[in-house]
């Protein structure tokens, strides 16, 4: 029998083992679609971004005009820009759902896969932040000023670090140039880390909704899950295209239609919606260094999740008390996101502080305590 090139060719063999003959648990649900959707969410901004970079000018006097030029004069420039900007929003929607699924079903016990995933999230956040600065509107400029200024809270080296990042004594032309360079580079770094992420995943195989070992019951990825992923991609592309074509500025800030002006501060400086939960946690602490530490902890706390797993069951499928806690955490994150978009005044200050406190309390204390209690109830006999 002639050898199958798909299984013998050095390069095709890798693709085959990752996407075609990959043994997958037969019972994984639609929640397992988001990994492949994230791949699509990465490819789309890279392709549109390369096309935008051909027309964009990374100079403070020309950046705003070059974005307007792309939207007005470049063939389908408006479409490329809208797909690129809203692609970031859908990237974050997918990654948050992907993390939520990993948390709910105990996938974090694959520690290497989980940790590389968090590194991917941090890299994505950095990419989105530097990208938001590039149109050089009011919110771009002031967002960059406020967020980079947070590094000055670091003792001893803070101020030097900020001036080094700025390339001067304020956010100016050198800052914009280096942010453009970073925004071009980081998505390719994300693509590289994604391969590492997948390599670790394929070492152990996928988790499943029951959280049990499924080696005895696996099916090939293609055609079963490739078809399922295709459906997921179709269902994701509908709201994505609807947003990009009908209401492309829905998730943006109106302030960004005004060119950057260092002499006029916007009434309410806020980041894009996907950072609002962390921004609310930052603002809830009246001390600068404390706020920065809380901001860092709000994301870095994910590294501690595998260490805080006390349950004898992996998944939350059969753990109703933990399920209630999980959905409380989700509701809490929605509250933080909403508070982050509101001005700093009563009652939003106290709501933000209570939501921030409950965020850390749920993750660090209530989940391990509940898991221990469930062990007692479930395994008492």
Curated annotation (Swiss-Prot):
Q: Which cofactor does it need?
A: heme b
Q: Does the keyword Transport apply?
A: yes
Q: CDD domains, alphabetically?
A: cytochrome_b_C, Cytochrome_b_N
Q: Which Gene3D superfamilies match?
A: Cytochrome Bc1 Complex, Chain C (1.20.810.10)
| InterPro entries, alphabetized | Cyt_b/b6_C (IPR005798), Cyt_b/b6_C_sf (IPR036150), Cyt_b/b6_N (IPR005797), Cytb/b6-like_sf (IPR027387), Cytochrome_b (IPR030689), Cytochrome_b_C_euk/bac (IPR048260), Cytochrome_b_N_euk/bac (IPR048259), Di-haem_cyt_TM (IPR016174)
Database matches in Pfam families: Cytochrom_B_C, Cytochrome_B
Can you supply a Gene Ontology BP term from the record? mitochondrial electron transport, ubiquinol to cytochrome c
**Membership in a protein family:** Belongs to the cytochrome b family.
Binding positions (a ubiquinone): 202
Print the miscellaneous field.
Answer: Heme 1 (or BL or b562) is low-potential and absorbs at about 562 nm, and heme 2 (or BH or b566) is high-potential and absorbs at about 566 nm.
- What does the entry list as the binding residues for heme b b566? 98, 197
TM spans, by residue?
A: 34-54, 78-99, 114-134, 179-199, 227-247, 289-309, 321-341, 348-368
Which GO terms fall under molecular function for this chain's record? metal ion binding; ubiquinol-cytochrome-c reductase activity
Q: Decide whether keyword Isomerase is in the record.
A: no
Q: What is its main location?
A: mitochondrion
User: Which membrane topology describes this protein?
Assistant: Multi-pass membrane protein
One GO cellular component term noted in the UniProt record for this chain: respiratory chain complex III
Give me the residues that bind heme b b562, please. Answer: 84, 183
The species this protein belongs to is Nothoprocta perdicaria
Q: Please describe what this protein does.
A: Component of the ubiquinol-cytochrome c reductase complex (complex III or cytochrome b-c1 complex) that is part of the mitochondrial respiratory chain. The b-c1 complex mediates electron transfer from ubiquinol to cytochrome c. Contributes to the generation of a proton gradient across the mitochondrial membrane that is then used for ATP synthesis.
Entry protein name: Cytochrome b
| Location of the protein in the cell | Mitochondrion inner membrane
Relay the cofactor remark from the entry.
Binds 2 heme b groups non-covalently.
């Amino acid at each position: 029998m002639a050898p199958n090139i798909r299984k013998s060719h050095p390069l095709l063999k890798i693709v085959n083992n990752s996407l075609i003959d990959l043994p997958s648990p037969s019972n994984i649900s639609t929640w397992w679609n988001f990994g492949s959707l994230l791949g699509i969410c990465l490819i789309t901004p890279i392709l549109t971004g390369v096309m935008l970079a051909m027309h964009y000018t990374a100079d403070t006097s020309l950046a705003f005009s070059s974005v307007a030029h792309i939207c007005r004069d470049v063939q389908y420039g408006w479409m490329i820009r809208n797909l690129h900007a809203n692609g970031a929003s859908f990237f974050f929607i997918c990654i948050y759902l992907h993390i939520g699924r990993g948390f709910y079903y105990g996938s974090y016990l694959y520690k290497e896969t989980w940790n590389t995933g968090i590194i991917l999230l941090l890299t994505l956040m950095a990419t989105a932040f530097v990208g938001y600065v590039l149109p050089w509107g009011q919110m771009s400029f002031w967002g960059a000023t406020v967020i980079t200024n947070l590094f000055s809270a670091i003792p001893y080296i803070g101020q030097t670090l900020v001036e080094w990042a700025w390339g001067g004594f304020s956010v100016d032309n050198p800052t914009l140039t280096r942010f453009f360079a970073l925004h071009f580079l980081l998505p390719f770094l994300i693509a590289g880390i994604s391969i590492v992420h997948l390599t670790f995943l394929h070492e152990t195989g996928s988790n499943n909704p029951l959280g049990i070992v499924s080696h005895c019951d696996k099916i090939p990825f293609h055609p079963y899950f490739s078809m399922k992923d295709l459906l997921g991609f179709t269902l994701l592309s509908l709201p994505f295209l609807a947003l990009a074509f009908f209401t492309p500025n829905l998730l943006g800030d109106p302030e960004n239609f005004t060119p950057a002006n260092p002499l006029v501060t916007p009434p309410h400086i806020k980041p894009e919606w996907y950072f609002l939960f962390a921004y609310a946690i930052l603002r809830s602490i009246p001390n600068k260094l404390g706020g920065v530490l809380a901001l860092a902890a709000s994301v870095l706390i994910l590294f501690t999740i595998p260490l805080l797993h006390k349950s004898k069951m992996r998944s939350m499928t059969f753990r109703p008390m933990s399920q209630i806690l999980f959905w409380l955490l989700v509701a809490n994150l929605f509250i933080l996101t909403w508070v982050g978009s509101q001005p700093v005044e009563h009652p939003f200050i106290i709501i933000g502080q209570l939501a921030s406190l409950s965020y850390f309390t749920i993750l660090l204390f209530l989940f391990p305590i509940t898991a221990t209690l469930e062990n007692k109830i479930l395994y008492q006999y």
